[in-house]
UniProtKB/Swiss-Prot annotation:
PROSITE patterns: INSULIN (PS00262). Expressed exclusively in Leydig cells of the testis. InterPro entries: INSL3/INSL4, Insulin-like, Insulin-like_sf, Insulin_CS, Insulin_family. This is Insulin-like 3. Disruption phenotype: Male mice exhibit bilateral abdominal cryptorchidism due to alteration of gubernaculum development. The keyword Signal applies. One of its GO terms (cellular component) is extracellular region. The lineage of its organism: Eukaryota, Metazoa, Chordata, Craniata, Vertebrata.
Amino acid sequence: MRAPLLLMLLALGSALRSPQPPEARAKLCGHHLVRTLVRVCGGPRWSPEATQPVETRDRELLQWLEQRHLLHALVADVDPALDPQLPRQASQRQRRSAATNAVHRCCLTGCTQQDLLGLCPH
């Protein structure tokens, strides 16, 4: 008799529990973003051998970032005054595409942990 009543109270308590507040957004740019990605994604587990030196794991992360073109957003937008070979229209198009990049968005408006998990390689 007590067990069903206890189970009902537990179910009622979990149903009445207030919803979780939205995840906090953190603005992450440059090396702060890379370090957070390593922490969130579990960087050391990426390497085939846990005995790999730290430099090798860092190199692996940087290679992965380059493959995903995420480092592009970590670098400042190209200034047409610095590179006269770039047409003005191409430069504007490049800035617009960078604004939609998830890494660039993390730097400008912030990312949640869920956003960062979407950037993980696995």
